[in-house]
């Protein structure tokens, strides 16, 4: 069995050894929950990796957004190059949920754009969890959403070995059952036959094909082939073909599920008729019968996840299968930036109840569709394994769960202190932050500026660009892989200033940043709370020149508390440096190959002159409006905007 082994030129230093020992001791003694309070730049990721190495237990690290998850994934891959470090996030680049608007009698069909590369990584994650123990999965909260049963997924795999008696026709039937497509194109999830050779492109790989040669009904050879060059890269003795969908179901189970679906359909149609809802009764019968026929013929149908209750053999109201069910019982769960991630997990369940209720009440879906859902918070609590909450500002929940006790990690291995905080008046803040940015850039450093709204971020970006500054903005409308690319460009110097809103807080690891400007710091609210301010201040804590300017006309309670906590930490760090004769130095961290490059992001290279083309500007604005309408459940308007975008982008 492959063991976890960290590959790093660094050794634990500062208070890292104490934090690692404390967490490992707690896990060894059976502590179910612990909290690591670690300041930005103190090496929390290295501490997590060290805990994994010392305990030799599989792990899942949950982050609250895809950008942070991608960053953690890159770091963990560098620490564990010989182990399986996987990435599991939502594979939707665009998602318009199925919905019905009763007021206008408009049904909106589900519309989604799936990122095939992220789907590949999801399959790679589940495959690794089922095949080996040296696995670290970095995930978003997508890990608490419904996923196919791990038992069925594992049961459906097809093992093949040299010398095995195997009928090629039966193997082709099995591959179709696993949702592989027959075709000559070398694409993931396809297979083809040429004479006595069957070629299959596995669901969890993007760069290799397995060629299985037969001599009669016996497997004669198994070769791994590069799909681009056609060269044989490896000769194998055995392989295991995993399903091309997490919702594959053995034929007998599928037929049993169809029987149960038909029973519910009869009951549902009868209830509608008894209520004199003839249109709804006809609608549910027509739609469900079509799905049933598709499942009988192909083993799947559009929206098959809505029948997951039956496919997984569950009762009404039972928790769905999720990625957590694929984890070994002794796995460790790290909740990164827990003050943000835990509330996000808590909020997931209620998100789509109203939308599904409308679909069910009007005959578009049966009540069993409600079981296609994320875990409730209580269900997540029941299923979570050994947990370590990780944050510079742990929330009330985490501290309650651990009895108010947290393992502190305040000393940075580099000797860096928390940044100096300066308060300046908010009047004239734009001019001042511009001048401060130019001075910082002239010294070869980067700048982060945080605003209160997306519009402010975009306007400030446009203004700074007009003034000759290389700048980009970062907010929730920017696609996942594009965010990763923008952060990489900032580190490489393609851009010098990054303007953002809430995304500027947790997890942005940019050692080149020597200035953080917080506009309107005295506007009390979520974005300017004590926790938010401490997190934002921490973005400047990776550079020896790091400083923070808070623009405010009054010092609020949140500002005072944040600055006092920063000063407390600075005092502890300064004393430690004096006692150990440490001279602070800026973190040295190479810019690694971005996830978007590795998964082959299909997006075009982001232009740093965004919104200069009027047509492009119109499309960007329409996309923002469409997403806002979807968030507000105005699906009818969202569809109209989507159609307009398609018209504008048509060749």
From Swiss-Prot:
Gene Ontology cellular component list: cytoplasm; excinuclease repair complex
Places the protein is found: Cytoplasm
Domain Helicase ATP-binding: 25-411
Ranges in coiled-coil conformation: none
UniProt free text on domains: The beta-hairpin motif is involved in DNA binding.
Chief location bin: cytoplasm
Subunit structure, interactors included: Forms a heterotetramer with UvrA during the search for lesions. Interacts with UvrC in an incision complex.
Region (Disordered): 593-615
Binding site for ATP: 38-45
Biological role stated in the UniProt entry: The UvrABC repair system catalyzes the recognition and processing of DNA lesions. A damage recognition complex composed of 2 UvrA and 2 UvrB subunits scans DNA for abnormalities. Upon binding of the UvrA(2)B(2) complex to a putative damaged site, the DNA wraps around one UvrB monomer. DNA wrap is dependent on ATP binding by UvrB and probably causes local melting of the DNA helix, facilitating insertion of UvrB beta-hairpin between the DNA strands. Then UvrB probes one DNA strand for the presence of a lesion.
Name the UniProt record assigns to this protein: UvrABC system protein B
Organism: Anaplasma marginale (strain St. Maries)
Domain Helicase C-terminal, residue spans: 427-591
CDD domains for the chain: DEXHc_UvrB, SF2_C_UvrB
Family in the record: Belongs to the UvrB family.
Motif (Beta-hairpin) on chain: 91-114
Keywords from the named record: ATP-binding, Cytoplasm, DNA damage, DNA excision, DNA repair, Excision nuclease, Nucleotide-binding, SOS response
GO molecular function, one term: ATP binding
Domain UVR span(s) in chain numbering: 616-651
Record-level GO BP terms: nucleotide-excision repair; SOS response
Origin superkingdom: Bacteria
